[in-house]
């Protein structure tokens, strides 16, 4: 059941625009907006929260909220830089919503929240004395204490020490389930999105390019632009395959390419002769770069497969792959 509906949302400033955004977000869903820097992720969150004006329609259930103030929309927002009030201590920051939502005051819920987030010992601390991870938990507590209908998270892990990121990601997932939240989370990190999301929307240059489950979006990009953003390797024109196809481009997984020293080997559906440009030995595999005419193939091969393989730069080599392993774009 859709709890948040966005129709034809448009916003323009200077040379940037959000272009006719349509989204349906279901009750209890962890929805991730995934895109590169400058793609409009944060701007879209701000328009949903009412912090930035836009045209189009935003509904919560059957209620139109696009004409309401941020306070009236009842949406919790955790900013990338946390946006905590430096003149208030931790406890005062968390309870700030009591100033405009008198009915929210609840000692029992407050106590449960600070125990869940393990911040009881921080309540009287000034904000300036907190670490990045502590600020993040306080910002989460403030958003949750307001008992908002929807929680918006803007790159919540960007200011966190990498050592604690997994711990925070795990906690976000647990909080989402524990408090039965509907969450919209902005990130540029694929692993973060894959771990957290029920559904992912790819946003590039202000446009929603693809929406689906993490498996569908991350393993089946709809077009070349999405594939490049997702870091797909070995994207080539289908003309090199010399077959009839409606597709212009294809990609082949580096782990599914075979190599042969004997240039007469043709055990795969497609094979190409090239020259080794570079090779790098890793812990348990080899990274190999092979130039085939104007194309550069990246190949990953387990060390165990290469026991009798002599490797050197400028060496001629044959590479091959099967039709079933091709992903068309």
Task: Please describe what each predicted stretch is.
Residues 234-235, 239-280, 304-329:
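Glycine/charge-rich catalytic "coupling/switch" loops of P-loop NTPases
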Residues 126-130, 134:
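Conserved ABC ATPase signature
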Residues 64-79, 100, 221:
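ABC ATPase NBD coupling module
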Residues 64, 105-122, 173-174:
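Conserved ABC ATPase "signature" region
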Residues 145-149:
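A short, proline-enriched helix->beta-strand linker immediately N-terminal to the Walker B motif
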Residues 14, 53, 68-69, 88-107, ...:
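ABC-type ATPase nucleotide-binding domains, specifically the catalytic core motifs of the NBD
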């Amino acid at each position: 059941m859709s709890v948040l509906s966005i129709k034809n949302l448009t916003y323009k400033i200077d040379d940037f625009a959000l272009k006719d955004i349509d989204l349906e977000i279901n009750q209890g869903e962890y929805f991730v907006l995934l895109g590169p820097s400058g793609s409009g992720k944060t701007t879209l969150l701000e328009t949903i929260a009412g912090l930035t004006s836009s045209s189009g329609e935003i509904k919560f259930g059957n209620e139109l909220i696009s004409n309401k103030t941020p306070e009236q929309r009842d949406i919790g927002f955790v900013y990338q830089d946390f946006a905590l009030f430096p003149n208030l201590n931790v406890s005062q920051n968390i309870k700030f919503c009591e100033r405009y939502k008198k009915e929210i005051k609840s000692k029992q819920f407050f106590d449960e929240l600070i125990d869940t987030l393990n911040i009881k010992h921080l309540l009287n601390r000034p904000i300036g004395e907190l670490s990045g991870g502590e600020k993040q938990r306080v910002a989460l507590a403030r958003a949750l204490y307001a008992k908002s209908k929807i929680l918006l998270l803007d790159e919540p892990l960007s200011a966190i020490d990498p050592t604690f990121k997994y711990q925070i990601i795990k906690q976000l997932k647990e909080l989402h389930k524990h408090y039965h939240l509907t969450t919209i989370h902005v990130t540029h990190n694929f692993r973060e999105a894959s771990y957290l999301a029920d559904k992912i929307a790819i946003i590039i240059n202000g446009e929603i390019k693809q929406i689906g489950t993490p498996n569908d979006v991350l393993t089946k990009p709809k077009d070349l632009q999405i594939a490049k953003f997702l870091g797909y390797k070995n994207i080539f024109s289908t003309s090199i395959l010399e077959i009839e196809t409606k597709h212009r481009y294809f990609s082949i997984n580096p782990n599914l390419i075979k190599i042969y020293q004997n240039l007469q080997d043709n055990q795969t559906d497609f094979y190409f002769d090239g020259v080794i440009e570079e090779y790098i030995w890793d812990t348990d595999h080899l990274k190999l770069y092979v130039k085939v005419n104007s194309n550069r193939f990246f190949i990953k091969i387990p060390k165990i497969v290469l026991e009798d393989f002599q490797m050197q730069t400028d060496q001629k080599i044959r590479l091959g792959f099967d039709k079933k392993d091709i992903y068309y774009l």
